[in-house]
């Protein structure tokens, strides 16, 4: 909130639910030794972020890890409470992680059917041992009017961010889409105010 009030950022993180995240052990059970934790926002956290966006004019980067989270997005969209300038990040995961849907056309189609008719910007993200660009999701998202996430946050053992962006640009160009950055991206997302730099 402090960064949004200062104008340093113009988007804030917005998770729409809580989900258990785990890594499967040799018996096919998530955690605990292999890793298991709860992630997300509880209802009071959601209301706090909604109020922060309303008070500051910040947009929101809205995470969707499970279908129930997308139901929450739809409910907020119908209630008119999704912050202006928001974008959905629909996450998928490899078979090694006990969370999210697999990176398939059918899974993406299911999520998109839930938001059919709603004016929502969206992207796909992928957590796994390879890049989202090594799955069908990257191209499918572009063909369906969305976008995809790249970077070391989702693929920590991958190539550099610069190399991932170069590859992403090639995929985007191959389907006839354009890359937008800076002010154009802010306009595309309809974020109420431009990003600023911290005061010197």
Q: Which residue ranges define each predicted feature?
A:
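A generic structural signal for well-ordered alpha-helical surface patches
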Residues: 109, 139, 143, 162-170, ...
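Hydrophobic/aromatic-rich structural module bridging two neighboring secondary-structure elements via a short loop
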Residues: 1-4
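Extended ligand-binding groove/face enriched in aromatic
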Residues: 7
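Mid-to-C-terminal alpha-helical segments outside catalytic/metal-binding sites
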Residues: 166, 170-200
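C-terminal helical cap(s) of enzyme catalytic domains, especially alpha/beta-barrels
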Residues: 22-24, 29-33, 158-177
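Catalytic alpha/beta core domains of metabolic enzymes, predominantly
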Residues: 10-151
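Soluble catalytic regions of large protease machineries
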Residues: 141, 153-156, 172
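Short Asp/Glu-rich motifs
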Residues: 72, 159-161, 191-192
């Amino acid at each position: 909130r402090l960064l949004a009030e200062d104008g340093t950022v113009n988007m804030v993180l917005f998770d729409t639910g809580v989900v258990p995240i785990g890594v499967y052990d040799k018996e096919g059970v998530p955690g605990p030794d292999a890793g298991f934790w709860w992630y997300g926002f509880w209802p009071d956290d959601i209301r706090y972020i909604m109020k922060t966006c309303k008070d500051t004019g910040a947009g929101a980067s809205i995470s969707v890890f499970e279908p129930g989270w997308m139901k929450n997005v739809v409910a907020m969209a119908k209630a008119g409470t999704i912050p202006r300038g928001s974008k959905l990040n629909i996450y998928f995961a490899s078979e090694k992680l006990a969370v999210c849907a697999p990176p398939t056309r059918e899974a993406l189609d299911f999520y998109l059917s839930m938001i059919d008719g709603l004016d929502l910007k969206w992207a796909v993200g992928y957590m796994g041992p390879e890049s989202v660009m090594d799955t069908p999701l990257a191209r499918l998202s572009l063909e369906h009017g969305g976008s995809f996430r790249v970077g070391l946050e989702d693929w920590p053992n991958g190539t550099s961010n610069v190399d991932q962006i170069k590859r992403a640009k090639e995929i985007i160009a191959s389907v006839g889409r354009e890359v937008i950055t800076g002010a154009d991206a802010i306009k595309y997302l309809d974020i109420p105010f431009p990003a600023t730099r911290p005061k010197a």
